[in-house]
Amino acid sequence: MPSFDIVSEVDKQEVRNAIDQVNKEVSTRFDFKGSDARVEQSDYALTVYADTDFQLDQVQDILSQKLSKRGVDVKCLDTGNVEKVSGNKVKRSVTVKTGVGTELAKKIVKCIKDSKLKVQASIQGETVRVSGAKRDVLQETIALVKKSVSDFPLQYQNFRD
């Protein structure tokens, strides 16, 4: 029985490379000369530091550009609020969302079941497994999910016959 998995994954190495590129660009740009602007990473949690709110927004824009150039979807970034650090410095927490959450998984399964396609969808941890009798029906399901869930980056893996 053909099946595929709906997942949401981010390549951690590509995120690391993008952060290195951001830090390199910030250190060489004239408008950041003498500032302490940088991006730090610990697993899937990023912290953006800068001297002012304006510089913080600029570093955030550079981060988005570099991530998209490296193939990481920027819809997976969850930006936090601006926090004051010592003196006049500011920081912002950015979380890289991975895995299909339970709410989104339930929404995907409900969307598939409401479409009346002849497939079965089941939630397995942070993935949604979809299986059906024919390949064509599975491809219709992929098109349906792409159309209905556009606010979160999803990948379709393990397409098996």
From Swiss-Prot:
Keywords: Nucleotide-binding
Pfam families xrefs: DUF520
GO cellular component: cytosol
GO terms assigned for molecular function: nucleotide binding
Family (UniProt): Belongs to the YajQ family.
NCBIfam families given in the database record: PRK05412.1 (NF003819)
Cited function: Nucleotide-binding protein.
PANTHER family: UPF0234 PROTEIN YAJQ
Protein name: Nucleotide-binding protein Tbd_1846
